[in-house]
């Protein structure tokens, strides 16, 4: 996918660690090179799955771009297999989170913007613990924050259904990452 082509695995865990039972991700700029922290599951989760992640930011970092998201395993090039963003945060809107869906039907060949639900609460404090969740079924994706439904992306059962709703064609892994260097 477009995201992974810009990153490479490195030896060591300088930006990923477990401390007091919590996974901690960090990012830094080292000699002009951005080093991001992230983890992903090697196995995928099937359709009819609810995924929940409890997370918080320890600070609002300029250029920071944390995300909790899912990508299909074994799908053709992005965005044909879809992408599910349970939570993204950008410095340009520090008191909001974004939940986004990407598909070929939405994005086309080269577009990057998906269908996004901006959390309507303009005073959302990302430095507090929150539970971000998505339920993935044949019918729809249902997004939640702290147990409250935030929005739905429905399968429209179009002739080109796999382009509009590919979310049950593949298993999806989970990715947790904290990137640095964005200007959003």
Residue positions per predicted region:
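GH16 jelly-roll
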Residues: 1-184
């Amino acid at each position: 996918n477009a995201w992974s082509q810009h990153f490479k695995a490195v030896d060591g865990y300088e930006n990923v660690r477990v401390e007091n039972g919590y996974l901690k991700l960090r990012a830094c700029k080292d000699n002009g090179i951005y080093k991001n922290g992230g983890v992903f599951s090697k196995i995928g989760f099937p359709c009819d799955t609810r995924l929940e992640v409890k997370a918080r930011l320890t600070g609002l970092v300029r250029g920071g771009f944390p995300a909790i998201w899912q990508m299909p395993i074994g799908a053709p090039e992005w965005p044909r297999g879809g992408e599910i963003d349970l939570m993204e945060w950008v410095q340009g809107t520090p008191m909001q989170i974004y939940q986004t869906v990407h598909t070929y039907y939405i994005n086309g060949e080269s577009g990057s913007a998906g269908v996004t639900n901006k959390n309507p609460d303009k005073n959302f404090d990302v430095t507090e613990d929150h539970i971000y969740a998505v339920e993935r079924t044949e019918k729809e994706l249902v997004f939640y924050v702290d147990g409250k439904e935030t929005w739905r992306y429905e399968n429209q059962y179009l002739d080109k259904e796999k382009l509009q709703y590919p979310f049950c064609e593949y298993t999806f892994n989970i990715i947790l990452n904290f990137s640095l260097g964005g200007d959003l």
